Curated annotation (Swiss-Prot):
This is Aspartate--tRNA(Asp/Asn) ligase. L-aspartate binds at E173, R219, H451, R492. Signal peptide: none annotated. CDD domains: AspRS_core, EcAspRS_like_N. Belongs to the class-II aminoacyl-tRNA synthetase family. Type 1 subfamily. ATP binds at R219, D220, E221, Q228, E485, G537, I538, D539, R540. It is found in: Cytoplasm. Homodimer. The gene is aspS.
Length: 593
């Protein structure tokens, strides 16, 4: 039907007859000559129809935006003054000799033009039009290249691409499951997988020592800019390996991805940072190292001060007091400071103290802050020295339980970095390693795994784990790119007794463990090899590589922030016949919109 994609028509095609197919992107009538911009996924091509061929010209006059056409003509150089170097085909045009309308289109709700600002709901309702835009074509094409690059690399490393079940058993993995009722087994449900975690471990026990899969996963959780109810991840598992093997594999993969897609050369070895250091310096387990701001502990300087907010947190074993210096921040108005104070309350902070350093050489007289009256001159000078304050700086303070300080001041660090244009350009990748095995749930005060309950502790002893669970470190690792967690993984537990110990510590008794994970515990008894793996978020990685602000921009048909699809109106009510067949009756309080 066609001989060329639009962008393939160039000066090498001069004087040749070509045929292209696509959409009418633009139609212009200049002095009795019709100019068409024909668009396909490769780009635009200008076609000219002259009035001498009356029959074809009459067809061209009928064309409107988004008509689907087949065009045949002779390629020629554009006249002087008509060259458009902004277009890949801007030095040539096609003199149309034939024209066929393959399909018509009414005036669309919006034109697939990258320069238009389009309401997001409208974009998703008419996603098939939105995807015609050049920017969306480029983003999804890059995503394809990313997946191809990943497959090529892992295939060369002797990995096997093995599919795992989509209809499986519900297991606790940190989020709510999407449940699928079974018609054959009334009253029972499958769960859509949050990840192939247990199946890939079982594959290691089955002798497939190198597995990967680019797989769909499902989590019924609240949505954010970088979350979707269904998402895609690169899932990897290896047997007879240690942490270093996994880290080197992923470093090699990312090095190739960045080189092939962005022509950026990454270092052979990425920097590593312990979880403890990341939280101490940045208040985050996924720090953006392009941001130069850091949190600085000052608890030892304010333990005996008269400012109770500082003193109580400084003397609390679970508390933390930090300073965050913003260079040249004295131009912040009172309203700006109040807004930042309001911002940190979103993350549990009760407020935001600050000191403006108007003139460092003037001592206390050169400082401005509501809290100065509660602090001794010695304490203030010690704080200024520790943060290396300069005239013109503003110092913000966080004092509370450590988890509140980390979350609120870490978020403030990010916000200040963006608001003040402090974020350096380029790419900053790092591994966050040496994670705690467990954390205490602040509500229930019970242990819960930092990653998942199949992660191996660094000490392979059930006795050591029981004696100091909150001090035990895990063989876990996260890969972070520019402040986004792109992936995470761990070495897994391969000894049944150690796995039972972990279950017991997080409140899963023997009966519950058998009901939910009996198949795994059985498999661990039959010669499970040491193994570990990682999962990388394809959506997030594609978002970063395309410089997008949301993963919805790199997913062909995404859900909205309410987990709905404006295009198909999903989710939708099930009919009574379907519900009856599945043995389901809706509770009276459930209504459908």
């Amino acid at each position: 039907m066609r001989t060329h994609y639009c962008s393939a028509v160039n000066e090498l095609s001069l004087d040749k007859q070509i045929t292209v197919c696509g959409w009418v992107h633009n139609r212009r009538d200049h002095g009795g000559v019709i100019f068409l911009d024909i668009r396909d996924r490769s780009g635009l091509l200008q076609v000219v129809y002259e009035p001498e061929n009356k029959e074809i010209f009459a067809i061209a006059e009928k064309l409107r935006s988004e008509f689907v056409v087949r065009v045949t003509g002779i390629v020629r150089k554009r006249p002087e003054g008509m060259i458009n170097d902004k277009m890949e085909t801007g030095r040539v045009e096609v003199i149309g000799t034939q024209l066929e309308i393959l399909n018509q289109s009414p005036t669309p709700p919006f034109l697939p033009d990258d320069h238009q600002i389009i309401n997001e709901d409208l974009r998703y309702k008419y996603r098939y039009i939105d995807l015609r835009r050049a920017v969306m074509q480029k983003k999804l094409t890059l995503r394809h290249k990313l997946n191809s690059c990943i497959r090529n690399y892992l295939n060369e490393q002797n990995f096997l691409d093995i599919e795992t079940p989509m209809l499986t058993k519900a297991t606790p993995e940190g989020a709510r499951d999407y449940l699928v009722p079974s018609r054959v087994h009334p009253g029972q449900f499958y769960a859509l997988p949050q990840s192939p975690q247990l199946f890939k471990q079982l594959l290691m026990m089955s002798g497939f020592d190198k597995y990967y899969q680019i797989v769909r996963c499902f989590r019924d959780e609240d949505l954010r800019a970088d979350r979707q109810p269904e998402f895609t991840q690169l899932d990897i598992e290896m047997a007879f390996i240690n942490e270093e093997d996994i880290l080197q594999l992923i470093e090699g993969l990312l090095k190739i991805v960045f080189k092939e897609i962005l022509n950026i050369t990454l270092p052979d070895k990425l920097p590593r940072m312990s979880y403890k250091e990341a939280m101490t310096r940045y208040g985050s387990d996924k720090p953006d190292l392009r941001n130069p701001l850091e949190l600085i502990d000052i608890a030892d300087l304010v333990k005996d001060c008269d400012f109770n907010v500082f003193a109580s947190a400084a003397n609390d074993n679970s508390g933390r007091v930090v300073a965050l210096k913003l260079p040249n921040g004295c131009d912040l108005s009172r309203k700006d400071l109040d807004n930042y104070g309001q911002f940190v309350t979103i993350y549990g902070a009760k407020g935001l103290a600050y000191i403006k350093v108007n003139d460092l050489s003037a001592g206390m007289a050169g400082l401005q802050s509501p809290i100065l009256k509660f602090l001794s001159e010695t304490a203030v000078h010690s704080i200024l020295n520790r943060v290396e304050a300069q005239t013109g700086d503003v110092i913000f303070f966080g004092a509370d339980k450590a988890h509140v300080v980390n979350e609120s001041m870490g978020a403030l660090r990010n916000k200040l970095g963006h608001d003040r244009n402090l974020i350096n350009s380029g790419w900053q990748l790092l591994w966050v390693v040496d994670w705690p095995m467990f954390e205490l749930d602040p509500q229930s005060n019970k242990l819960q795994p930092m990653h998942h309950p199949f992660t191996s502790p660094q000490e392979l002893s059930a006795e050591a784990l029981r004696s100091k669970p909150t001090q035990t470190l895990a063989k876990a690792y996260d890969i972070v790119i520019n402040g986004y967690e792109i992936g995470g993984g761990s070495i897994r537990i391969h000894q049944p007794e150690l796995q039972k110990t972990v279950f017991d510590l997080i409140g899963i008794d023997e009966q519950e463990a058998h009901e939910k994970f009996g198949f795994l515990l059985d498999a661990l008894q039959y010669g499970a090899p040491p193994h570990g793996g990682i999962a990388l978020g394809i959506d997030r990685l594609a978002m970063l590589l395309t410089d997008s602000t949301s993963i919805r921009d790199v997913i062909a048909f995404p859900k909205t922030q309410t987990a709905s699809c404006p295009l198909t109106s999903a989710p939708s009510p099930a009919g009574n016949a379907q519900l009856t067949e599945l043995g389901i009756r809706l509770a009276p309080t459930i209504t459908t919109k």
